[in-house]
Amino acid sequence: VKNDRINRRTFLKKSLFAVESLAILTGVSGLYGIFGERFWIQSTTVRLSYRRYPASFEGVRIVQFSDTHIGKYYSLEQMNKVVDLLQRQEPDIICFTGDLFDSKFGEVSDEVIPILSRLRAGMGKFAVLGNHDMRMDSDRVRDVLERSGFTVLVNESRSIERGNGRLQVVGIDEMLHGKPDLPLALKGVKRDDFVLLLAHEPDFADTSLASQVDLQLSGHSHGGQIRIPLYGSIFTPELGQKYPIGLHAFEGSEFHVYTNRGIGTTLFPIRFNCRPEITVFVLEKKLP
């Protein structure tokens, strides 16, 4: 009986210790996610080769950022630091894939213009709108981006020429609140042009795959924002569930979609095992 009491006492002590340790670990993880990881931006370099990629564009650096969600949980001061980091990547082309603001933005919309205007890219700055932008005031968000030097693409394309090669930057309308029309966006694009598509929601890739799009850049999902080891993200939004994070290839095709983890947060100001990200794409022509 005495040994049984000792075993029970030992079990209770160990159980209490385990519960306390878990609570402490959860608290530490929460603090890390709120005050640490969500500001610890990772620069990811992705190298890809394509038969259709023009040799004259080799060495061009395409830099993507997404989902800044400027507002309650992401300040203009923090956005200034993002711009500094983007510029250090020496971009030739800058692509923003939507959700500039997180909530009603008031006068902060004008204050962000000089910050975004500091971004320099010799071949252009391009953007599409996200679902948060569409829900609030898409015309105003578009105006902010355009006054900051971005070309906002809505079912349309822009051609970039270098040497004897040409690259088409195509932007699709937002899927949840807009009217995406890929055939319209590709109108005038020649069959041998390399096509870089900006689409806020990554699951648009299923449509892109059946077209002449070569590389789709997306955001929206934040990579899940909170990712549990050995499990993955605990939540991904509508149209961000099939291709929620990183690079995805498709059998029998050179087409890829890359889902950027974004800069800011939404719903809760926390990231765990899912650092904010900017992505640098270095593409090259695939030899026969």
Where do the language-model regions lie?
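C-terminal segment of N-terminal export signals and the immediately downstream linker at the start
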Residues: L25-V63, Y73-E77, K81-D84
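N-terminal secretory signal peptides and thylakoid transit peptides that target proteins
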Residues: V1-L22
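Beta-strand-turn-beta hairpins that frame and shape the catalytic cleft
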Residues: Y50-I62, R158-V169, F250-H256
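Extended active-site neighborhood of metal-dependent phosphoesterases/phosphodiesterases
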Residues: T44-R47, E111-P180, K187-V189
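Active-site neighborhood of phospho(di)ester-bond hydrolases with catalytic His/Asp-centered motifs
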Residues: F65-S66, I94-G98, K125-N131, L153-N155, ...
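Conserved beta-sheet core of the metallophosphoesterase superfamily
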Residues: P202-V282, L287
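Membrane-embedded segments
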Residues: V60-V141, S148
